[in-house]
Every structure is written in structure tokens, then in C-alpha cells.
């Protein structure tokens, strides 16, 4: 026992030194060990990015930082993301007259034809919402969809009433099930040819030149194509095009005679689910909810 006592005494003396060596760091009254992997700033809003960076520079092992009380503009997000590529940040994004947490799975601007519009640059901040599965940015001035490359898990996408000409980024969204593209300036549908999970597609009022890319989408349940090759109500889609699509897609309900939102487009159980999910910021799977809605 006498031999153990000096050893225990030595361990007691070394313990404070070990703790001191490990160390802690404090920011906005939040104290964490320097070897932590997760930081939650809670209700503390960051006002000084330089001070935040000085804090994070002392945490070499951190991989997740939640700071949802801080409203972040695009330039601030870019600055932190570039400096700390190893860290996943939880932010509240601020763009236009909207705010959105980066952990949201659904988002809609809830715009109509009288709402103030936002540009592609405004929406590019959404690339930080990696978990988004449903997105509605209809009734805006979107002409560049590049930011969609960072949202590979989208299942519902509404881009109606914008200025889109190039839909190439849509080819990177293999999980898409519902897609509204009406009232844009789209000519080439090729990027849609690989979307084998797509159930609902609305391309009314565009400038489509070739419909062949749609002929392989045999899983489609609904396809709205009224005036999809022009904007003139007096020049209907050629009957030959309609016949070709009906032959290629015998199990698809194809509507070539009704306006983009008429003919039952918004009277389907899946639209009811979409309306419900965009009332909040949480994605609702169609299969799970349709039975309830019906």
C-alpha cells in the first residue's frame, strides 16, 4: 500500500497538467475542448466572422458547426465554406426576403405573379441546403440552374414561370418525381431523358423543338404539353407530335389541350401532398402521404 501511495500522488499531480494540455477555447460564452468534433452555438448569433475564424482555427478536429441563430448572406457562406471545407455548417440562409435553415428538406418562395422576383444569383445560395428534396422557385427570374448540381436529392422541383433556356443541370437529378417547367424558354429536352423516376411532367408554354427525349420515359403517369413548342394559343401543338408521344407512352395521361394548370393538373393527390409540404420546410414522400390524402 505504501508503494502505491506515491504513484497515486504522482497521477493526481499530473492530471491537471494533462487537462491543461488538452485545453479549451471559448467563443460567445460557449466553451469547448480544443479536440472537439462538434460545436453548437445555440442561440448565439455571430456578428464578427474574423472572431469566429480565430475560434475555429483552434479546433483542428471539428467537422460540424451549428450556428442557426446567425442569418448568413451568400458571401459570408462562401467565405467560411472555402476556408473550412472539412466542416459542415448549420446556418440560416438569408436571400431576398426569405430565410431558410440549411437542414431544411423542402422550400418554396410561395410566389405568385404579383410577388417580387429573385434571380439565379439570389438562389445560388441554396447550394448549401444539401438535404433539400423539394424546391419551388416558380414565378421568378431564374435563367441559370447551375446551383442544382449541388442538390442531387431533389424529388420535387417547380421552375414554372421563369426565364430558363438550358435545363442541362436537371440531368444530375436522378431522383426527380415531379417537375414543373411551364412558361419558360426551353428548346432541348434531352436532359430529361434519363429521369426514370419522373411521374409528373409539365412543359406547357415553351419552345421545344424535339420531343424524342421523352419517348423513353415510360414510367411517366402525367404529361402536360399544351403549347409546349410556342406561346401562341392560336397555334396548337401538331397532332403528329401528340400521336407520337401517345404511341410511345401508352400508359401516360397526356394532355395537349388544357392550359398549364388546368385539366386536372392541380387536382391530383400528389399535388395535395406538394401543397402540404410547401406549407412548411419538411419533405413528405408521395407514397407515404397519398393514401392519407385520398
Task: Identify the residue ranges that each predicted region occupies.
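Bacterial N-terminal signal peptides
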Residues: 7-16
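Concave beta-strand-loop units of leucine-rich repeat
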Residues: 21-143, 147-165, 169-187, 191, ...
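Positively charged n-region of N-terminal signal peptides that target proteins for export
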Residues: 1-6
Amino acid at each position: 500500500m505504501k508503494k502505491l501511495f506515491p504513484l497515486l500522488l504522482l497521477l493526481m499531480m499530473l492530471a491537471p497538467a494533462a487537462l491543461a494540455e488538452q485545453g479549451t477555447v471559448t467563443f460567445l460564452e460557449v466553451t469547448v475542448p480544443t479536440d472537439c468534433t462538434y460545436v453548437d452555438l445555440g442561440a448565439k448569433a455571430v456578428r464578427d466572422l474574423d472572431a469566429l475564424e480565430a475560434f475555429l482555427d483552434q479546433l483542428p478536429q471539428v467537422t460540424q458547426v451549428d450556428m442557426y441563430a446567425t442569418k448568413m448572406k451568400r458571401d459570408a457562406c462562401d467565405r467560411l465554406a472555402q476556408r473550412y471545407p472539412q466542416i459542415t455548417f448549420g446556418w440560416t440562409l438569408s436571400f431576398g426576403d426569405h430565410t431558410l435553415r440549411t437542414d431544411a428538406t423542402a422550400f418554396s418562395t410561395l410566389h405568385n405573379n404579383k410577388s417580387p422576383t429573385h434571380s439565379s444569383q439570389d438562389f445560388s445560395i441554396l447550394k448549401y441546403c444539401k438535404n433539400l428534396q423539394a424546391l419551388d422557385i416558380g414565378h421568378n427570374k431564374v435563367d441559370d440552374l447551375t446551383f442544382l448540381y449541388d442538390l442531387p436529392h431533389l424529388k420535387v422541383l417547380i421552375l414554372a414561370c421563369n426565364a430558363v433556356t438550358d435545363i442541362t443541370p436537371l440531368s444530375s437529378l436522378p431522383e426527380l418525381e415531379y417537375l414543373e417547367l411551364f412558361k419558360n424558354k426551353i428548346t432541348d429536352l434531352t436532359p430529361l431523358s434519363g429521369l426514370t423516376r419522373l411521374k409528373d411532367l409539365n412543359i406547357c408554354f415553351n419552345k421545344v423543338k424535339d420531343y424524342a427525349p421523352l419517348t423513353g420515359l415510360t414510367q411517366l403517369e402525367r404529361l402536360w404539353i399544351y403549347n409546349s413548342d410556342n406561346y401562341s394559343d392560336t397555334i396548337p401543338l401538331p397532332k403528329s407530335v401528340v400521336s407520337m408521344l401517345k404511341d410511345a407512352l401508352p400508359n401516360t395521361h397526356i394532355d395537349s389541350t388544357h392550359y398549364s394548370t388546368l385539366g386536372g393538373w392541380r387536382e391530383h393527390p400528389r399535388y395535395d401532398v406538394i401543397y402540404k409540404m410547401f406549407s412548411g420546410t419538411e419533405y413528405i414522400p408521395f407514397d407515404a402521404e397519398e393514401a392519407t390524402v385520398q
